[in-house]
Regions:
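Cytosolic regulatory regions built on CNB/CRP/Popeye-like sensor folds
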Residues: 1-191
């Protein structure tokens, strides 16, 4: 409800547990009428969750230079804006010439980065094979740049996706994300 995503944490009960549910309309009523800053309090509490998926994403995303300088709440918003998607073997994540609209963080599987030798030769030259923790399009999806190569699933691939639209929503709300955008634009567009 807070991040408009399906999950914010994995909860395991080792002995027994009590489960409660709060409908979205009741949550919104609580937010609007009772506590002015309840969302921020909840977001700060979510930061304390020791969740395997969150830790994996945090570790992987720290490889991105602009991500390192973001505030913790901005990082959390990014994590919870990602969607887990599974692709079958031979599926294309990106095709050469297509506009990059998503950032991908590979959780499981192998993605092959390849290009054609020459227009008349049908064989592909494999540039690299990307595995768990690899990130695809971390800059180009922000700039809506076109892909220079094909990204094909060598095996079935499970990954987390962040759309350009979602990152723009975060940018509109968070000053540190706007700064990150400017940094990327300066690095890429200004020689």
């Amino acid at each position: 409800m807070i991040y408009n995503c399906k999950r914010t944490a994995t909860v395991e009960s080792c002995n027994y547990g009590t489960l409660a549910a709060l409908k979205k309309e009741n949550f919104l009523e609580l937010q609007n009428s009772t506590f002015e800053n309840i969302i921020e309090v909840f977001k700060k509490q979510i930061c304390l969750y020791d969740d395997e998926v969150k830790m994996f994403l945090a570790f992987a995303m720290e490889k991105i230079s602009y991500f390192k300088h973001l505030k913790l709440l901005t990082k959390q918003e990014i994590f919870h804006s990602m969607e887990r998607v599974t692709y079958e073997k031979d599926a294309l994540l990106c095709k050469k010439g297509d506009i990059a609209t998503k950032l991908f963080v590979i959780q499981d599987g192998i993605v092959e980065v390849a290009c054609k030798y020459a227009p008349r030769i049908d064989e592909e030259f494999v540039i690299e094979r990307l595995g768990r923790g690899s990130i695809i399009n971390h800059r180009s999806f922000m700039l809506e740049d076109d892909a220079d190569t094909d990204f094909r699933c060598l095996t079935s691939v499970s990954c987390f996706e962040l759309t350009a639209d979602k990152i723009k929503e975060i940018k509109d709300k968070r000053e540190d994300m706007r700064t990150a955008y400017r940094t990327v634009e300066e690095e890429v567009l200004i020689p």
